[in-house]
């Protein structure tokens, strides 16, 4: 009997080709677009993004073309609770969230997988660029064939339970080949551009988005230097992130950067580039893929943002499942709330959320 797989289809080229590849490999494929858009004008404005109504139309058209059933499933409440509310709360606390990592952790590989299992379906699949393999008794994640498109940074939270039930067929290919396959089989989405912004924010202006939702909570405050001297007025801490230089709305005669955010005092601390450089961080909420827990110091390559090349570091376990990360070289703008992710060559070791 054919194994069944529920493919999350965003209307983009990657998930479309993932569905096609799995069908070619002999799976019984069912396409699903997750309805995560909220009942407000933000999502109407956002038409064309991976959460929009036009994305549903694209996904349905692809499903018809490759001959698989297609459904829209409602994940609105779970998405609002685990992604949107988390996103807003983090900015309010002076941290910089990563909504894609939260979505992978709580929606795509949790709520979506739960739905598949309740329906008696064997696997879920996505268009992620990553490779899942089984080594001995353990599932591992390796970087994809396409280094530029590799998405392992956002997958460090996956558990053995989830990996055993997840397929990522695009990981074996370069993006150019995925587009080529889409064109060969006549998919109109073959040249659809990649969505790079936050799916639920129409213009990528997260400050405006939060201000519109919670006008009473976003208040003006002071820009200060490291000594606490007032330098000017900011429009609300949710508009800023560590390392930011542009959009401060104030001129200093020299480049100034956001080096800290103090939510309790409603202050944004500005400093020089040198103030952004650091070699150490502490991360919490850690998860490891090739093993359950880190028991002793380990040499890895680590990165503190999605688009960065990993740098050499030593990770050391400390109390409460947290980890200390010591980089060999200074890192620019280590940002609370973002994830630090560890590798050994092309093997994903794990990661955690930067605490300090």
Swiss-Prot record:
Matches recorded under CDD domains: MnmA_TRMU-like (cd01998)
Protein's cellular compartments? Cytoplasm
Pfam families in the cross-refs: tRNA_Me_trans, tRNA_Me_trans_C, tRNA_Me_trans_M
**What is this protein's function per UniProt?**
Catalyzes the 2-thiolation of uridine at the wobble position (U34) of tRNA, leading to the formation of s(2)U34.
Disulphide bond pairs: 103-199
Q: Which GO terms describe its molecular function?
A: ATP binding; tRNA binding; tRNA-uridine 2-sulfurtransferase activity
Q: Which residues bind ATP?
A: 8-15, 34, 127
Could you name the Gene Ontology cellular component terms for this entry?
cytoplasm
Which Enzyme Commission number(s) are on file for it?
A: 2.8.1.13
Q: Which family does it belong to?
A: Belongs to the MnmA/TRMU family.
Q: Where is the active site?
A: 103 (nucleophile), 199 (cysteine persulfide intermediate)
NCBIfam families this protein is in?
PRK00143.1 (NF001138), trmU (TIGR00420)
Q: Which reaction does it catalyse?
A: S-sulfanyl-L-cysteinyl-[protein] + uridine(34) in tRNA + AH2 + ATP = 2-thiouridine(34) in tRNA + L-cysteinyl-[protein] + A + AMP + diphosphate + H(+)
InterPro entries reported in the protein's UniProt record:
MnmA-like (IPR004506), MnmA-like_C (IPR046885), MnmA-like_central (IPR046884), MnmA-like_central_sf (IPR023382), Rossmann-like_a/b/a_fold (IPR014729)
* UniProt keyword list: ATP-binding, Cytoplasm, Disulfide bond, Nucleotide-binding, RNA-binding, Transferase, tRNA processing, tRNA-binding
Q: Which Gene Ontology BP terms does the record give?
A: tRNA wobble position uridine thiolation
In terms of PANTHER family, this protein maps to:
MITOCHONDRIAL TRNA-SPECIFIC 2-THIOURIDYLASE 1 (PTHR11933:SF5), TRNA 5-METHYLAMINOMETHYL-2-THIOURIDYLATE -METHYLTRANSFERASE (PTHR11933)
Question: Please, which domain of life does this record's source organism belong to?
Answer: Bacteria
Q: Which gene encodes it?
A: mnmA1
Site, as annotated: Interaction with tRNA: 128, 338
- Write down what this protein is called: tRNA-specific 2-thiouridylase MnmA 1
């Amino acid at each position: 009997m054919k194994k069944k797989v529920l493919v999350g289809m965003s209307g983009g080229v990657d998930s479309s080709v993932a569905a096609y590849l799995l069908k070619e490999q002999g799976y019984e494929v069912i396409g699903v677009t997750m309805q995560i858009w909220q009942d407000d004008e933000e999502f109407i404005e956002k038409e064309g993004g991976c959460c929009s109504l036009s994305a549903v139309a694209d996904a349905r058209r692809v499903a018809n073309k490759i001959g698989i059933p297609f459904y829209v499933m409602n994940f609105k409440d779970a998405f609002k609770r685990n992604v949107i509310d988390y996103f807003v709360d983090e900015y309010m606390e002076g941290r910089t969230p990563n909504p894609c990592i939260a979505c992978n952790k709580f929606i795509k590989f949790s709520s979506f997988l739960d739905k598949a299992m309740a329906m008696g379906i064997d696997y879920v699949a996505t268009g992620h660029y990553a490779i899942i393999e089984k080594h001995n008794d353990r599932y591992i994640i390796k970087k994809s064939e396409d280094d530029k498109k590799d998405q392992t940074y956002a997958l460090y939270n996956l558990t053995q339970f989830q990996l055993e039930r997840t397929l990522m067929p695009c990981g074996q290919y370069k993006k150019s080949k995925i587009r080529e396959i889409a064109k060969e089989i006549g998919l109109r989405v073959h040249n659809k551009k990649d969505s790079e912004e936050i799916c639920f924010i129409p213009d990528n202006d997260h400050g405006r988005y939060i201000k519109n939702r919670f006008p009473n909570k976003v208040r003006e405050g002071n820009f200060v230097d490291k000594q606490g001297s007032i330098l000017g007025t900011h429009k609300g801490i949710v508009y800023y992130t560590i390392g930011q230089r542009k959009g401060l709305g104030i001129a200093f005669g020299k480049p100034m950067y956001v080096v800290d955010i103090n939510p309790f005092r409603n202050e944004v601390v500005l400093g020089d580039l040198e103030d952004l450089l650091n070699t150490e961080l502490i991360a919490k909420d850690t998860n490891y893929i090739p093993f359950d827990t880190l028991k002793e110091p380990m040499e890895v390559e680590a990165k503190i943002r999605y688009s960065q090349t990993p740098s050499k570091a030593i990770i050391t376990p400390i109390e409460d499942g947290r980890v200390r990360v010591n980089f060999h070289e200074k890192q620019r703008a280590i940002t609370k709330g973002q994830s630090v992710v560890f590798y050994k060559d092309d093997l994903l070791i794990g990661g955690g959320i930067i605490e300090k």
